[in-house]
A protein has these predicted regions:
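Patatin-like phospholipase
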Residues: 1-227
Length: 227
């Protein structure tokens, strides 16, 4: 909740900063998790791998060259973990993009929201992979578009353009499938400005979302038991 406070200055500055929230949001969210393991906020991908022995791959989208960038301890060892996490989640209009060496990094979901194909490239045994996938429509298993109305703000218009473009691009990419997939369904698109505001301000809604995720996981586990 403390990470997403919005004031008038932020709204005015977002015109030049290209977003409402900067990397401080990521630091606020992950600080207690890292400190619980006695890890520094400035920990690099290489250092995090040495600590965890987890081959973590994070995907971001570089806007100027219009390409997906895969980041790990082998490709970008000296980049800070929190910086890379910020790059991968910078939804246009909401989060300030990370700009390094004339490259503009935004949410990796533009072309790679669910990097299953990349995972199978490195690990071909589908039985060893567990996917966790979100979807807004249980019947079509697709993401819902966001609508612009006469009451929509400029920020909501930008978010709508971003999300709907991402949805269209994702639908054109051929995706592999695996049996071991936890499908998490939500009632509405959680990336609209209204949904983000409500989830930040409404503690009960956050509990409901967590419970929905738990229910989806239990439903998946029940199918495993039957097998």
């Amino acid at each position: 909740h403390d990470a997403f406070k919005v004031n008038a200055k932020q709204i005015f500055d977002s015109y030049y900063n290209k977003g409402l929230f900067d990397k401080k949001v990521t630091e606020t969210i992950f600080k207690p998790l890292l400190e619980a393991k006695n890890l520094n906020l400035n920990i690099t991908l290489k250092e995090f791998y040495e600590f965890s022995n987890i081959d973590l791959h994070i995907f971001t989208f570089e806007l100027n060259n219009f390409q997906t960038i895969e980041m790990s301890h082998t490709t970008h060892p000296e980049l800070q973990l929190l910086q890379v996490l910020t790059m991968s989640s910078s939804l246009p209009g909401i989060f300030v993009p990370i700009i390094i060496d004339n490259c503009c990094y935004i949410d990796g979901g533009v072309l790679c929201n669910y990097p299953l194909n990349q995972c199978l490239r490195d690990h071909t045994n589908k039985n060893e992979i567990l996917g966790i996938k979100s979807s807004y429509n249980k019947e079509t298993d697709k993401f819902a578009n966001v609508e612009v109305t006469s009451e929509s703000s400029l920020l909501e218009y930008i978010i709508c353009l971003s999300i709907n473009s991402m949805n269209y691009i994702r639908d054109t990419i051929k995706m592999e499938t695996i049996e071991n997939t936890v499908k998490c369904y939500v009632l509405e698109n959680p990336l609209t400005l209204g949904s983000i505001k409500e989830s930040i301000q409404n503690q009960e809604l956050r509990r409901q979302l967590i419970q929905m995720g738990e229910d989806d996981a239990l439903e998946f586990l029940a199918t495993i038991v039957k097998l």
